[in-house]
From Swiss-Prot:
Molecular function per GO: lyase activity
Gene Ontology CC terms: extracellular region
Annotated organism of origin: Salmonella choleraesuis (strain SC-B67)
Known role: Secreted effector that irreversibly inactivates host MAP kinases by catalyzing the dephosphorylation of the phosphothreonine residue in the pT-X-pY motif present in MAPKs, via a beta-elimination reaction leading to a dehydrobutyrine residue.
Gene it is expressed from: spvC
Name by which UniProt lists this protein: MAPK phosphothreonine lyase
Gene3D superfamilies: phosphothreonine lyase
Family: Belongs to the phosphothreonine lyase family.
Lineage: Bacteria, Pseudomonadati, Pseudomonadota, Gammaproteobacteria, Enterobacterales
Amino acid sequence: MPINRPNLNLHIPPLNIVAAYDGAEIPSTNKHLKNNFNSLHNQMRKMPLSHFKEALDVPDYSGMRQSGFFAMSQGFQLNNHGYDVFIHARRESPQSLGKFAGDKFHISVLRDMVPQAFQALSGLLFSEDSPVDKWKVTDMEKVVQQARVSLGAQFTLYIKPDQENSQYSASFLHKTRQFIECLESRLSENGVISGQCPESDVHPENWKYLSYRNELRSGRDGGEMQRQALREEPFYRLMTE
């Protein structure tokens, strides 16, 4: 399906992502997860499997690269322009109503398999059932071969609390966990080879492609102390335990 490219002179603002910084105050989102961890975890365990209806007629990787300043597909605004090495996708009508709390996933695949990986995941990424309102993928033609987002972390999924008070509901957490497990399975089923996981991220042994970082309380440089702190993040624990 060709990407819809309206003839509109629109300004699409960048993703509202808070940069990592030292000594960040723990936000209420994190406190809520910590204080209600056992209750949320127990609720999630009792919930049925989530089902994700895949979007049809979505652009392939080549089509994404040609999205230019503004395009639309399956309710997502797309843009790939200027010197930005990423192709951005943002749901026009967000499903999550809270403020970004720093939680995000990277997907790392072999450099030459990014188009194949995108083909495997596109129906899920554009799905109306997806819990991810904002995501991006590296434009491999714009990065040098040894760049961080060339060797791995080619996909980034930004997770926002679903509730207006910027707290995660158990149902949304469950849906998100099921979604990332589905992404993992889809890549494996399609024979995609994993890439280099960022030093800044953490992941359990059973994740071959995805990794996690909270960018309000960590930086890109990584280190064992940071990774240990990330492993203790309640959001990460709810995704993995």
